[in-house]
Amino acid sequence: SGETEDDFRTTGGELCAIDEEGMSARATQAQEELTYAGYYSTSMFPPVELLYVTGTENDALASALQSMWSTTLGVNVMLRGVTQSEYNARMEAGNYELALQKVTALYDDAMGFLDRWCSEDEQNLISYENGTYDVLMGVARASEDPVARTAFLHDAETMLLGETALSPVYFDGTAHMLRDTLRGVYTDGFGNSYFAGVRANTD
């Protein structure tokens, strides 16, 4: 973000569980919330449909989620793989229960990921509407103070995830190896690595 040593994700904390302990805690929380909602037995919970665009990566992800939800929570998830056009039509009509959606940004900034969930944004396929969220995003957009801007964006992100409008499942990433005798690899916010500045580590 430029205003501190840490970037937006570091200052905001992890979006989802990234280790075994965290995943176990989230699973326990999910079970408790099902009980709190009145589903004392998993047999009481109705089957749910997971909508996604058919493709090797999505097919594998959908199957993995189906298995995890069944094993951990006892929830029966029916998979519905469709074409991109059918997916778009169903999303726009609100004709879905759960849906996989890959989210990318055109530029390396948190605004690129959060702006699309404003009520009137054409990319808002989930039709999320929250006036307070819109205000937070508007203030962040207009702010000339980078620290305040980041704070407003974090508040908006917390609200979006807290209302379970969406939930991160995984993040794309890349990996590279660099000898200890070299330095200078630059990695941008999209995970792309650049090696033009690699040089000998003379320190």
Regions found by a protein language model. Give the residues of each.
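Short secondary-structure junction motifs
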Residues: 43-45, 74, 164
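Short beta-strand and adjacent tight-turn residues that come in two discontinuous sequence segments
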Residues: 78, 82, 100-101
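Structural motif corresponding to alpha-helix initiation and N-cap regions
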Residues: 27, 84-85, 154
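Surface-exposed acidic, glycine-flexible loop patches that form ligand/cofactor-binding
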Residues: 35-44
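Structural transition elements
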Residues: 1-36, 57-59
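Short, well-ordered beta-strand elements
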Residues: 45-54, 77-80
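Short alpha-helix C-terminal cap/hinge motif
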Residues: 65-79
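Detector for C-terminal structural segments
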Residues: 1-10, 56-67, 88-203
